[in-house]
A protein has these predicted regions:
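Loop-rich catalytic cores of soluble enzymes, especially ATP-dependent carboxylate-amine ligases
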Residues: 106, 117-137, 141, 150-284, ...
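Terminal catalytic/cofactor-binding subdomain
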Residues: 1-132, 139-143, 309-312
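Short, flexible loop/turn elements at secondary-structure junctions
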Residues: 30-32, 68-70, 101-103, 149-155, ...
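Histidine-centered divalent-metal-coordination microenvironment in nucleic-acid enzymes
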Residues: 27, 139-152, 286-293
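Cationic, histidine-enriched alpha-helical/coil surfaces that engage anionic ligands
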Residues: 323-328, 334-430
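Short conserved micro-motifs at the rims of enzyme active sites and ligand-binding pockets
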Residues: 39-42, 78, 111, 159-160, ...
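Long, well-ordered mid-to-C-terminal structural blocks that present hydrophobic/aromatic surfaces
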Residues: 254-354
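Long, well-ordered alpha-helical scaffolding segments within enzyme catalytic domains
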Residues: 79-92, 160-196, 301-326
C-alpha cells in the first residue's frame, strides 16, 4: 500500500473519520444487599437468555450481560446502555448490580453457579464448565465492558474506489482493520493508565495462578487495573498472533487450535479482537476493545470519557504511520507495557519497556502526537472530541486526577465493599 496516497485519501474525506457504528457490551454481577453474590436464577422476565438480543448472562447465572445494537454515535450507544441498565435494575427486586469489575464478597467455598442453558444452547454451558476448570470460577466473575467499533461504510467505499488498499472490499477491510489493531496493541497501555478502574480487590479474593495453578491473593504492585493485569482475565499462555495479514492471522490461530491450546478464536482473551461477520465474506467487520473496566462513579457503569478516548485512539491508530507488521518481540513488549500500566499504574515515574522514559513522559508524547494528527485530519473539529482530548492532556499532567486514582483513594477511605454498595444503592434509587 502507498502510505502517502492512503493518507491523502483519508485527509480528503476527513469528515468520515469520526463516523461509524458503535456498540457496547457490559457485564455486572448481581449481589445481595450485603454485597454477597446473589444465587437466584437469571430473572425470568427477560425470557430465554440464549435468544434475548440485549440482556443475557455471561459466565455465571449471577452475571448479567447487557448488549447494545450497533448505533451511529458514541452518545447513542451510551444512552442505550443506560436504558438497558435501568431495565435490569428495575427487574431484579432487592438485588443490586455490583458496580466494580472485580468480584464482590465471595465466602469460603462459595457456590458460583455457572450460567444454565438448555436445548440448542446447551453447548454454552459445557463451554463454561471447561473454563471453570481451566481458569477458576472466581476469575470468570471478573466483569467489564467491550467497546465495538466499525468505520463508516462510506469511508470503506471511498478507499475501495481510490484503489489504495486493493481492488476488493475484502482487501480494504483487511488493510484498515489490521493496521488499526497493530497500532492499538502498541498503545493500549496508555488507555489502561488513563482509565483503569480496578485498583484493589476485596481482601479475601483469591484466584488460580495461571502459572502454578494454586490459589493466590489478587494483588500486584501499585495496581490500577487488576482486571487487565496478569492476575486478571488472561489466557493461561501468552500466544503470538500474526497480525501482518488476514492469511497470517488465520494461520496462527489455526495452529493454536491444531495444537489443542485453544478451542477456537472465541477462547482468545486478547485486549482487542478483530471480529468477522458472514455478510462481509470472511473479511474483518469491526474491532472489539476489551480493556475497559466498569466505572463505579457512573450509574450505567460506563465512563463516557473512556469510550470517547477509545474511539480517538482507534482513529489515531488508523492514521499513525506503521510498518505493516508486529514481531513477536514487539507484541511481548506491548504486553509488558500493559502489565506495567495495570500493576504499577499508580506510579507515574515507572519506566516503559520500550525506552528509558517514564510513563508520564511517554503518555504526554503520545497524547501530543494524537492531538496534532487528529487536528490535522479534522477529527477534533467536533466540540465533544476536542474537549475529550483536552481532558486527557489534563490527566497526564495531573495523574492524581485519573479516575482510577480517585477510586483508589475512596476504597482506602471507605472500604472496598461499603464504597461500592453505597454507590450502587444511590444509583438504584434514581
Amino acid at each position: 500500500m502507498n502510505t502517502q496516497d492512503f493518507c491523502f485519501i483519508l485527509k480528503q474525506n476527513s469528515h468520515l473519520l469520526r463516523e461509524g457504528c458503535f456498540g457496547l457490551e457490559k457485564e455486572n454481577v448481581r449481589v445481595n444487599q450485603d454485597g454477597t453474590l446473589a444465587l437466584t436464577p437469571h430473572p425470568a422476565v427477560f425470557g430465554d437468555k440464549g435468544k434475548h438480543p440485549y440482556i443475557t448472562t455471561d459466565f455465571s447465572e449471577s452475571q448479567v450481560e447487557m448488549i447494545t445494537p450497533p448505533l451511529p454515535s458514541v452518545g447513542e450507544a451510551l444512552g442505550f446502555m443506560e436504558t438497558l441498565h435501568d431495565v435490569v435494575t428495575e427487574n431484579i427486586g432487592d438485588e443490586l448490580l455490583w458496580p466494580q469489575s472485580l468480584p464482590p464478597v465471595l465466602k469460603e467455598n462459595q457456590e458460583i453457579p455457572i450460567a444454565h442453558y438448555s436445548g440448542e444452547f446447551k453447548d454454552k454451558e459445557y463451554y463454561r464448565q471447561k473454563l471453570a476448570g481451566t481458569y477458576g470460577k472466581e476469575r470468570q466473575l471478573i466483569s467489564g465492558i467491550h467497546f465495538n467499533f466499525s468505520f463508516s461504510e462510506k469511508l470503506m467505499d471511498v478507499l475501495l474506489k481510490s484503489g489504495v488498499c486493493g481492488s476488493s472490499m475484502e482487501e480494504v477491510r483487511e488493510t484498515v482493520y489490521f493496521r488499526v489493531v497493530r497500532n492499538f496493541l502498541k498503545y493500549r497501555w496508555l488507555f489502561i493508565w488513563l482509565y483503569g478502574e480496578s485498583p484493589l480487590a476485596e481482601e479475601t479474593l483469591n484466584v488460580i495462578s495461571l502459572k502454578t495453578g494454586e490459589k493466590q491473593p489478587m494483588k500486584c504492585g501499585v495496581s490500577l487495573s487488576l482486571r487487565t493485569s496478569p492476575l486478571g482475565y488472561r489466557n493461561r499462555e501468552e500466544f503470538f498472533i500474526d497480525y501482518s495479514s488476514l492469511e497470517a492471522y488465520n494461520m496462527s490461530i489455526d495452529k493454536l487450535i491444531r495444537e489443542n491450546r485453544i478451542d477456537g478464536p472465541h477462547e482468545l482473551y486478547l485486549p482487542v479482537r478483530i471480529k468477522f461477520l458472514e455478510k462481509d465474506n470472511g473479511s474483518p467487520s469491526y474491532i472489539e476493545v476489551r480493556i475497559v473496566d466498569l466505572d463505579p462513579f457512573t450509574k450505567s457503569g460506563v465512563c463516557a470519557s473512556a469510550i470517547y478516548f477509545s474511539h480517538l485512539l482507534l482513529v489515531y491508530s488508523l492514521l499513525k504511520e506503521e510498518n505493516g507488521s508486529l514481531t513477536e518481540e514487539e507484541l511481548q513488549r506491548a504486553t509488558r507495557n500493559q502489565d506495567m500500566a495495570s500493576c504499577y499504574g499508580r506510579d507515574e515515574k515507572k519506566e516503559l519497556k520500550c525506552c528509558s522514559t517514564t510513563v508520564q513522559q511517554k503518555a504526554t508524547s503520545i497524547l501530543e502526537d494524537m492531538e496534532r494528527i487528529l487536528s490535522e485530519y479534522g477529527v477534533l473539529d467536533d466540540e465533544i472530541y476536542r474537549q475529550e482530548m483536552q481532558h486527557n492532556l489534563y490527566l497526564v499532567q495531573n495523574p492524581e486526577k485519573r479516575i482510577g486514582m480517585v477510586l483508589y483513594e475512596n476504597i482506602n477511605r471507605v472500604g472496598f465493599v461499603p464504597f461500592h454498595l453505597e454507590n450502587e444503592r444511590q444509583y438504584s434509587e434514581t
